[in-house]
């Protein structure tokens, strides 16, 4: 099988830089074309030793296009670029929101997918010190990714999977599911709940410091317990030992004092749709 021709649109931005740097590491597998509109982005591409390609030329040559643009611009920009794709092209977006909100422009003769990183898990063994310091992924730290095929050809989507595994490399597993299921992972699982709780934990460290507790001690105590308790609750400790009776009481109190009684409604389809609409258009909140 020949090399896959991959264009990265938005290659001078944050995610465009990350993904294109990794794809460039495998020239024997990928012919890489970098597309960027902004002056700063073009300069960033040149500073990394590459040359930008005009978008018309890139789209004409591409087997797969990586659409590394901000989520809030996917609807607007896909309406410009998708009509220019050659028939049969694979088109990868990096977040499911625009697809779930039906703002992504589609074509019947092209294949569309979502590819999003899980980021390195603290339960995943890394091979080197440098890999353990990669908190985001894609810079040495192994991670999993999630993907969906929005529509299109299975063989072309298989190419999209290979592209995604390299642009987020090193990748352990690529879990394929629906775009809606990815959206329940983010924003519902990791942003509405996870990030909110973790932000509150960081604020709680500040409260500990106000009470004379050294910040280093509070951070160590908090993160150590997060590691231990998440291992316990998620089944990573052999035998699934129960937490202490006192901890169970504290969890019950926390559910009353910290969590809303109806917090699980964030898993309702209606809530998800309103959350996504608000995230894509914060000037028109739906919830």
Swiss-Prot record:
Name-wise, this protein is D-apionate oxidoisomerase
GO terms for molecular function, please? metal ion binding; nucleotide binding; oxidoreductase activity
Question: What does this protein need as cofactor?
Answer: Zn(2+)
Q: What is its EC number?
A: 1.1.1.421
This protein's pathway reads: Carbohydrate metabolism
Extract the InterPro entries matched here: KARI_N, NAD(P)-bd_dom_sf, PGDH_C, Semialdehyde_DH-like_C
* UniProt keywords, alphabetically: Carbohydrate metabolism, Metal-binding, NAD, Nucleotide-binding, Oxidoreductase, Zinc
Q: Which residues bind Zn(2+) per the record? A: 116, 186
Record bears the keyword Zinc: yes
**Similarity remark:** Belongs to the ApnO family.
Q: Which Pfam families match?
A: KARI_N, PGDH_C
Q: Catalysed reaction per UniProt?
A: D-apionate + NAD(+) = 3-oxoisoapionate + NADH + H(+)
Name the enzyme group at the top EC level.
Answer: oxidoreductase
Q: What does this protein do?
A: Involved in catabolism of D-apiose. Catalyzes the conversion of D-apionate to 3-oxo-isoapionate.
Binding of NAD(+), residues: 13-15, 36, 71
- The gene behind this protein is apnO
Specify the superkingdom.
Bacteria
């Amino acid at each position: 099988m020949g090399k896959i021709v991959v264009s990265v649109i938005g290659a001078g931005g944050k995610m465009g830089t990350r993904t294109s740097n990794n794809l460039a590491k495998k020239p024997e597998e990928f012919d890489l074309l970098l597309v960027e509109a902004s002056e700063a982005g073009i300069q960033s591409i040149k500073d990394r030793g590459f040359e930008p390609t005009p978008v018309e030329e890139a789209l004409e040559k591409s087997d797969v296009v990586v659409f590394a643009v901000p989520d809030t611009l996917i609807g607007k920009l896909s309406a410009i670029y998708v009509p220019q794709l050659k028939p049969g092209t694979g088109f990868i977006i990096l977040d499911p929101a625009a697809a779930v909100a039906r703002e992504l422009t589609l074509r019947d003769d092209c294949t569309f997918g979502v590819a999003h990183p899980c980021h390195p898990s603290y339960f995943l063994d890394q091979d080197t010190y440098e890999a353990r310091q990669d908190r985001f992924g894609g810079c040495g730290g192994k991670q999993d990714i999630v993907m969906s095929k929005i529509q299109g050809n299975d063989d072309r989507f298989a190419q999209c999977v290979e592209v995604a595994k390299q642009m987020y490399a090193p990748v352990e597993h690529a879990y394929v599911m629906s775009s809606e299921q990815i959206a329940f992972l983010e924003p519902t699982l990791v942003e509405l709940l996870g990030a909110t709780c973790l932000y509150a934990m960081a604020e709680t460290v500040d409260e500990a410091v106000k009470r004379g507790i050294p910040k280093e001690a509070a951070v160590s105590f908090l993160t150590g317990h997060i590691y231990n308790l998440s291992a316990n609750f998620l089944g990573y400790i052999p035998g699934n030992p129960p937490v202490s009776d006192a901890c169970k009481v504290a969890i019950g109190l926390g559910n009353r004092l910290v969590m809303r009684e109806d917090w699980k409604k964030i898993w309702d389809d209606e809530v998800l749709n309103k959350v996504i609409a608000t995230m894509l258009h914060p000037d028109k909140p739906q919830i």
